[in-house]
Amino acid sequence: MNAPTRTPPPSNGGHGSTGSTGSTGDAAPGGGTGRGPAATARGHAALAKTQVLIEALPWLSRFQGATIVVKYGGNAMTEPALREAFAADVVFLRHSGLRVVVVHGGGPQITAHLERLGVPSTFVGGLRVTTPQTMDVVRMVLLGQVNRDVVGLVNDHGPFAVGLSGEDANLFTARRRPAIVDGREVDVGLVGDIVEVRPETINALLGSGKVPVVASVARGVDGGVYNVNADTAAAELAVALGATKLVVLTDVEGLYADWPASDEVISELSITELEQLLPSLTAGMIPKMEACRRAVRGGVPQAHVLDGRVPHAVLLEIFTDDGIGTLIMAESGTSPEPGTPPAPAARPAGIVPAGEPTGGTP
């Protein structure tokens, strides 16, 4: 389809010239030609917008048909303006030819609902103690509230989102996980580690042009239902799908070089460099960086940790030359240039063993 074009102004022999009728061109209020400072400013603004589009072009070309898994959480999930921006980003990616999967938790929403029920929230070793009563609330909130909210937000911008959980079609299979406190195992209830991923359903949805939105609960090998970490779930799914990128939204700018002594953000680092830093990271960042490490070690070319407080953070990272946040790659200095061959296609459908356990729970 041809792009629409602007209708050119009528020719009058040039600025200030007169034709046989004595016309001096399009008059503006006050006798000017409409080419004053306001028009110039509009032209500069339009030019800036075209520069943004041109900068995005090689990245749009490179990632055409690529699969991207986004772990959605933090302020981007709770602040109305950021929620709208995220949903718009997802639909923009879909219209740009990318295959997008959203994985979410919902820790704050679960805690708030438990408080309303008078049920205290207890955490041991970063894991929510999940009794059968608590697990009922986790499922209800993640599937009945958070998942429906995310699906609705995305579908307000385009009818693509389909909600499901790790239980559906046995997408995730989990095994019970204890917490480790002072070197000892502590039972925390229905908390699990993902041990298998069946990506067939997600691949089918992606193949039909949909955007799967996945809640982080899993069916257990024992037939039970388990609360699983959303960062880890996103990483395992990215590996199983053969994704090009894993994107993790956080409430910080990225990985800091020497926190708290410095607020300098590391722009990119290799997986080896990340593994050297892991023991020194703060507790809140460890599960996110462990998820990135798992994804890259599992064959995902790139993992990103982004500040979800920045509107349209996902688009800024993927479609601009500088990006934002922290990029983790297989080897330092090997971030792909626009126009390089895309990552391998998704793995064939089937059961994909998951990696080692990481992260806390919602």
UniProtKB/Swiss-Prot annotation:
One of its GO terms (biological process) is arginine biosynthetic process via ornithine. Keywords: Amino-acid biosynthesis, Arginine biosynthesis, ATP-binding, Cytoplasm, Kinase, Nucleotide-binding, Transferase. Its main location: cytoplasm. Residues 346-355 have a biased composition (Low complexity). Coiled coil: none annotated. Residues 1-11 have a biased composition (Pro residues). Substrate binds at G106, G107, R128, N227. GO terms for cellular component: cytoplasm. It is found in: Cytoplasm. It comes from Frankia casuarinae (strain DSM 45818 / CECT 9043 / HFP020203 / CcI3). Belongs to the acetylglutamate kinase family. ArgB subfamily. GO terms for molecular function: acetylglutamate kinase activity; ATP binding. Residues 1-42, 329-362 are annotated as: Disordered. This is Acetylglutamate kinase. The record marks K71, K288 as: Transition state stabilizer. CDD domains: AAK_NAGK-C. It is an enzyme of class 2 (transferase). NCBIfam families: argB. Pathway: Amino-acid biosynthesis; L-arginine biosynthesis; N(2)-acetyl-L-ornithine from L-glutamate: step 2/4. The keyword Cytoplasm applies.
